[in-house]
């Protein structure tokens, strides 16, 4: 029996806004073909502190300050963001064309590596009772990862603005009491591995248009870690307009933090415990309007060849330049030097003798 025909008028396809510009790049069509897809597999290791050669993935035992003013943590106590920049195959031999190709991140498979190692309850841990096993890793945990075509942009927020962070870390400068809630001057790019303490920086929700990030924080003293492992979950990186992160300069940026909780030693001291994260990113080619005009490329080339001089300030608030004169062409010098120059209603420069 043939299926019955639908009654009523046929509905037109749903119209959605057409995206023109994403991350400062004018977006065009997707390039198809057998060579238009590539995949990147890698993993990022944790940066918990590593106080010695035997404690990779652990922080130093945490010590507590007596007052807010005296808080000065050791660098080995501070879990930091892990970050990597992955060079991708070059797509454009000629950057002077009107349209060029860019890699676009489409999907991601990711998971934490080594979750079963947290079942170890016999290595120097504090016993739960006289004849019991050691305490498992537990407490506050934070799991975060990002994929982008540019470095992750960060916003600084502090728990205690009077904390003195150690050398070798990058932290919000000139902190005030407003830094404990929101200070828009504390901005940064995640451009260095093992340098940005997790407790100081969060992804900036007002930016990161060309990056996808995901994170979960679970707080508490005795909260157990809850981690899943599977090779069937895929995260789609496309936005509501069907466009993913565009890899500028043929570079893919990845970052991660996986703090699983605290390990309690036999003595009662505690250390952060972190694990590695696996990434598998699928990318495709997308045609875009060339964001690098020839004038920009030539200027950049000339600037790179020009030696940089760290001299006295000649621009900005402390500029020592008093006056700059610009001349164009020649003109007659009148007997009476009184002249008035103005722009007429047609936009032409006029000189009137007074």
From Swiss-Prot:
InterPro entries in the record: Capsid_VP1_Polyomavir, dsDNA_vir_gr_I_capsid, Polyomavir_VP1_sf
**Signal sequence interval, chain numbering:** none
Q: What is the effect of changing residue 158 to V?
A: In strain: Isolate YI, Isolate TKY-2A, Isolate MAD8-BR, Isolate NY-1B, Isolate N1, Isolate N4, Isolate G3, Isolate C1, Isolate CY, Isolate MY, Isolate AIC-1A and Isolate Tokyo-1
Which superkingdom, per the lineage?
Viruses
How changing residue 66 to H affects the protein?
Answer: In strain: Isolate MAD11-BR
Q: Which GO terms describe its cellular component?
A: host cell nucleus; T=7 icosahedral viral capsid
For this UniProt record, give its keywords in alphabetical order, as a comma-separated list: Capsid protein, Clathrin-mediated endocytosis of virus by host, Disulfide bond, Host nucleus, Host-virus interaction, Late protein, Phosphoprotein, T=7 icosahedral capsid protein, Viral attachment to host cell, Viral penetration into host cytoplasm, Virion, Virus endocytosis by host, Virus entry into host cell
Q: Where in the cell is it found?
A: Virion; Host nucleus
Q: Which residues carry this modification: Phosphothreonine?
A: 330
Upon changing residue 269 to T, the result is: In strain: Isolate YI
So what does mutating residue 117 to T actually do?
A: In strain: Isolate YI, Isolate TKY-2A, Isolate MAD8-BR, Isolate N4, Isolate C1, Isolate CY, Isolate MY, Isolate AIC-1A and Isolate Tokyo-1
Return the domain comment text from this UniProt entry: The intrinsically disordered C-terminal arm interacts with neighboring pentamers. The unstructured nature of this region allows to make different interactions depending on the structural context: pentamers present at the 12 icosahedral fivefold axes bind five pentamers, whereas pentamers present at the 60 icosahedral six-fold axes interact with six pentamers.
Role, per record? Forms an icosahedral capsid with a T=7 symmetry and a 40 nm diameter. The capsid is composed of 72 pentamers linked to each other by disulfide bonds and associated with VP2 or VP3 proteins. Interacts with a N-linked glycoprotein containing terminal alpha(2-6)-linked sialic acids on the cell surface to provide virion attachment to target cell. The serotonergic receptor 5HT2AR also acts as a cellular receptor for JCV on human glial cells. Once attached, the virions enter predominantly by a ligand-inducible clathrin-dependent pathway and traffic to the ER.
Which protein family is named in the record? Answer: Belongs to the polyomaviruses coat protein VP1 family.
How is the quaternary structure described?
Homomultimer; disulfide-linked. The virus capsid is composed of 72 icosahedral units, each one composed of five disulfide-linked copies of VP1. Interacts with minor capsid proteins VP2 and VP3. Interacts with host 5HT2AR.
This protein is called: Major capsid protein VP1
